[in-house]
């Protein structure tokens, strides 16, 4: 799958008002184990506690931009549900989580 840089930049722009810029820290332990430079991204510090908010927020924002969404529905009892519910709230649309 090819993903143009323009799409990544657009997603970053959509996400900026919704998510935290979480910390990126070098892991000395994993870097030593692998012989490379390994960094950890602390997505557990995200507004909903996981990275799942990124996908849900980007999709809902994109659909809102195009006027193609009236409500969000997610079938999840975990992080995806929280991300979807939060993104729906930010974009002032109803969400059904089941």
Predicted features, each with a name:
Residues 1-98:
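PLP-dependent amino-acid enzyme catalytic core
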């Amino acid at each position: 799958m090819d993903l143009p840089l323009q799409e990544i930049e657009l997603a970053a722009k959509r996400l900026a008002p919704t998510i935290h810029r979480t910390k990126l820290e070098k892991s000395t332990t994993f870097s030593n184990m692998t012989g490379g430079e390994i960094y950890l991204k602390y997505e557990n510090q995200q507004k909903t506690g996981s990275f799942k908010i990124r996908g849900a927020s980007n999709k809902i924002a994109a659909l809102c931009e195009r006027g193609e969404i009236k409500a969000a529905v997610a079938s999840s009892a975990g992080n995806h549900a929280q991300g979807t519910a939060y993104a729906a709230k930010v974009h002032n649309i109803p969400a059904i989580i089941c």
